[in-house]
């Protein structure tokens, strides 16, 4: 999975950056928001909790997904500006990220114990 930033602009009135991106996924279906959020946060060098993926759209037959994300200066700004349902969706994505990281840590510790 490869993420490319197409356009990025500052929106100082709303304390955020707005990013248009494309995800190329040759070997699999449409990626989950949690995977894309992790990649975007790494590319933009920001904390995962301030990256809100507004939308992701795939076209039939193409192996790419176009999306739009908002990167806030803080979680407080995100919660103040975004509608409540978007904040709830964002929190669910963050929970998915946490559970994925916990599962990968557990599997790594089990593998290291087996090697010993």
From Swiss-Prot:
- InterPro entries for this protein: eRP_eS24_sf, Ribosomal_eS24, Ribosomal_eS24_CS, Ribosomal_uL23/eL15/eS24_sf
Q: Residues annotated as region Disordered? A: 81-116
Keywords from the UniProt entry: Ribonucleoprotein, Ribosomal protein
Q: Which GO terms describe its molecular function?
A: structural constituent of ribosome
One cellular component term (GO) for this entry is: ribonucleoprotein complex
State any GO BP term from the record: translation
Q: Where is the composition biased (Acidic residues)?
A: 96-116
Which Pfam families does this one have?
A: Ribosomal_S24e (PF01282)
PROSITE patterns attached here?
RIBOSOMAL_S24E
Q: Which domain of life is it from?
A: Archaea
Give the family per the record: Belongs to the eukaryotic ribosomal protein eS24 family.
Q: What is this protein called?
A: Small ribosomal subunit protein eS24
């Amino acid at each position: 999975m490869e993420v490319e930033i197409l356009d990025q602009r500052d929106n100082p009135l709303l304390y955020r950056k707005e990013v248009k991106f494309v995800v190329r996924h040759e070997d699999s279906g449409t990626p989950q928001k949690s995977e894309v959020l992790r990649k975007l946060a790494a590319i933009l060098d920001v904390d995962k909790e301030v990256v809100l993926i507004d939308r992701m759209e795939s076209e039939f037959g193409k192996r790419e997904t176009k999306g739009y994300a908002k990167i806030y200066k803080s979680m407080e700004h995100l919660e103040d500006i975004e509608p409540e349902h978007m904040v709830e969706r964002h929190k669910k994505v963050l929970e998915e990220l946490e559970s994925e990281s916990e599962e990968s840590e557990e599997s790594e510790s089990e593998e290291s114990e087996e090697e010993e």
